Amino acid sequence: MKIFDYEDIQLIPNKCIVESRSECNTSVKFGPRTFKLPVVPANMQTVMNEELAQWFAENDYFYIMHRFNEENRIPFIKKMHHAGLFASISVGVKENEFNFIEKLASSSLIPEYITIDIAHGHSNSVINMIKHIKKHLPNSFVIAGNVGTPEGVRELENAGADATKVGIGPGRVCITKIKTGFGTGGWQLSALNLCNKAARKPIIADGGLRTHGDIAKSIRFGATMVMIGSLFAAHEESPGETVELDGKKYKEYFGSASEYQKGEHKNVEGKKMFVEHKGSLKDTLTEMEQDLQSSISYAGGKDLKSLRTVDYVIVRNSIFNGDRD
């Protein structure tokens, strides 16, 4: 079995058929809607909040609201629907979450997207939650995860998941691989490739991306959508504390199972870091779109599907060739 990650891969160009990269279309259909980019910010407290969720929806980007303010979820769904926008929320698998789904159904509050957000998603509890949502809210698009194996993808799809999220601990602020010895850190792109071979429904590649070029690589190896944390963190609009160190501005960024998120030092699988302030999120999204348009032009196409068939080489961690600090 070939094992590789993002840094090990270079995609091989095809003949360009466009006059300008602006002719290339980066939009993606995901569930009932079409979005400008195949990218979603991680549903983490230092990446996503209600104001950003609303802005993303208004501007035709996909988002997933995190689940760490449970009591705010019903008002959030109402607010989004009142504004004529789609609602995309997260749930866990504890007993109160099953009751929450029933409450949504009895109130006729139907989020367009529901993400079951668990670190180890190949589990009976997630399978039971998928079935529960599909029973009570059959029109909601259910994203389930996270998994790292073809078996996990198949079981969640068979339970009724409309999409699966692939990635166990490859993110910058996730230390699952260190604390447990398990995960897809260091071989996330291979894991995505294997899972894609088993998938019949869309996959979200979650974690491990460090550059915009990694979006194109994710699509090449099977992702329909890519979830990104660190590249979206530390913007002007991002949640999180801003600090100044040696004349430079930084913003905090922490993992979803860190003690900073949990409020206690127990079962910690995330850490906190400060990321240099990156300016406007809108500028980053524009740059991301332009870079992906360039990727499509190198693939010899005009849309994302051209990326799925390009050849590649495995270069074993040499693609930065001294260009990285």
UniProtKB/Swiss-Prot annotation:
SUPFAM superfamilies: Inosine monophosphate dehydrogenase (IMPDH) (SSF51412). One of its GO terms (molecular function) is GMP reductase activity. It catalyses: IMP + NH4(+) + NADP(+) = GMP + NADPH + 2 H(+). PROSITE patterns: IMP_DH_GMP_RED (PS00487). Gene3D superfamilies: Aldolase class I. NADP(+) binds at residues 203-226. Keywords: NADP, Oxidoreductase. GO terms for cellular component: cytosol; GMP reductase complex. It is an enzyme of class 1 (oxidoreductase). Its EC number is 1.7.1.7. The keyword Oxidoreductase applies. CDD domains: IMPDH. Coiled coil: none annotated. The keyword Oxidoreductase applies. Disulfide bonds: none annotated. The active site is at C174. One of its GO terms (biological process) is purine nucleotide metabolic process. Catalyzes the irreversible NADPH-dependent deamination of GMP to IMP. It functions in the conversion of nucleobase, nucleoside and nucleotide derivatives of G to A nucleotides, and in maintaining the intracellular balance of A and G nucleotides. HAMAP family: GMP_reduct_type2. Belongs to the IMPDH/GMPR family. GuaC type 2 subfamily. This is GMP reductase. It comes from Staphylococcus epidermidis (strain ATCC 35984 / DSM 28319 / BCRC 17069 / CCUG 31568 / BM 3577 / RP62A).
